[in-house]
Amino acid sequence: MFQPAPKRCFTIESLVAKDSPLPASRSEDPIRPAALSYANSSPINPFLNGFHSAAAAAAAGRGVYSNPDLVFAEAVSHPPNPAVPVHPVPPPHALAAHPLPSSHSPHPLFASQQRDPSTFYPWLIHRYRYLGHRFQGNDTSPESFLLHNALARKPKRIRTAFSPSQLLRLEHAFEKNHYVVGAERKQLAHSLSLTETQVKVWFQNRRTKFKRQKLEEEGSDSQQKKKGTHHINRWRIATKQASPEEIDVTSDD
């Protein structure tokens, strides 16, 4: 019976890689996209090398790239050998219209950039607290933990700037009584055009300052007393005089 000729496989790169005379019109042709190259052809198929030379001669006679679809038509006209795996090559317009899909998911670093940038900057919430309701993240995320802590902080208390006359009145009241409560504090605050909270805080701070000054004075007095005793003891040792405790007042001598 008639035996069909064995199927032969070739690559487009093998056609254009051979040294062949090119027509003069090649320089005027537009640049075509480079064909996809495969691995170097191995000598497994004995008919492959001979077919490459014949196909190159045929392509040289017709002119390389004389037709935009020539490269792909050559590949279609000769079915590939089943022994050699060959992947179909799509035309250039198909490549442009359908880009290759990504084989893996995007990197987590780039995926995280799609999130709300405010979750990475707790100082933004601390600075603009009235926008806190717009920045709600996952309750279990560490970024959200930082944001909630920043929002949960109590605002700093504004320090009251007292006038000299107010300070003088407060000092006089403190000398009379270190604790002002009830109606007395309310009356004092009304006379100074202050709130009861401001008067209360001032007296608390003033009592703390008074105790600190008292401790410092007692500490300095004790240090001076110790220094004086030390000098007296040294003078007695130098002059070999007995201390008052060592003098026997019951002796008749």
From Swiss-Prot:
Keyword DNA-binding part of the UniProt annotation: yes
UniProt xrefs under CDD domains: homeodomain (cd00086)
Compositionally biased tracts (Basic residues): 225-234
Intracellular or extracellular location(s): Nucleus; Cell projection, Axon
Keywords: Cell projection, Developmental protein, DNA-binding, Homeobox, Nucleus
SMART domains: HOX
Keyword DNA-binding: yes
GO BP terms, alphabetized: anterior/posterior pattern specification; brain development; cell proliferation in forebrain; cerebral cortex development; cerebral cortex regionalization; dentate gyrus development; forebrain cell migration; forebrain development
Region annotation (Disordered) ranges: 213-253
GO cellular component, one term: nucleoplasm
Protein name: Homeobox protein EMX2
Source organism: Mus musculus (Mouse)
